């Protein structure tokens, strides 16, 4: 019994260490995003770091298109094509569904139709992208990027495939929510006139959305 208790305590300690390391890494990433005036260039630099943070293979960040009915990829890791992906805001794709429902999804296997239908009867994975690239997507962690003061949808962050083949953890789920909030602030700053950025940021700090 003592051996079992010791084993459980050791496991809990290791889990706490992993969680702390993850949160420290996440804070470093968010600090860099807050400090930049060029979010597009920074995210290209940070894409590998974000993948490392989530122990993931690939990352895609979408922004809402000018038509407000679609999302367009702005950052893509692991794809040789430079052409942006444009997806309708609908259940026709997982990222599109997240944009439509504004919900966070942690999918264990995108090819499991039963899992997708348990989320939404119309939800499907765009297998055509895998066929075109030769890549096999399995796990997917996806979150909407929403400007909290206005409740405006700004984009979607999508993280693909854990390197160990396991589902994304609960810590990763919490982390992608924090990352999406940080990206929302960065997107808002990019879309505002220079003179309004400081006021916008101060408003968020005052409302405890972010810490200075």
PLM features per residue range, with description:
Residues 1-41, 52, 72-74, 154, ...:
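Signal-transmission linkers at sensory-effector interfaces
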Residues 47-51, 57-65, 71, 95-96, ...:
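Short, hydrophobic-rich beta-strand element in sensory/regulatory alpha-beta domains
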Residues 68-77, 85, 106-108:
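Amphipathic coiled-coil signal-relay and dimerization helices
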Residues 79, 156-166:
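Short beta-strand-to-loop transition segments that serve as allosteric relay/switch motifs
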Residues 82-112:
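Acidic/proline- and glycine-rich, intrinsically disordered low-complexity segments
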Residues 110-139:
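Signal-transducing coupling segments at domain and membrane junctions
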Residues 138-149:
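A short, aliphatic-rich beta-strand micro-motif
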Residues 173, 177-185:
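Allosteric cytosolic regulatory segments
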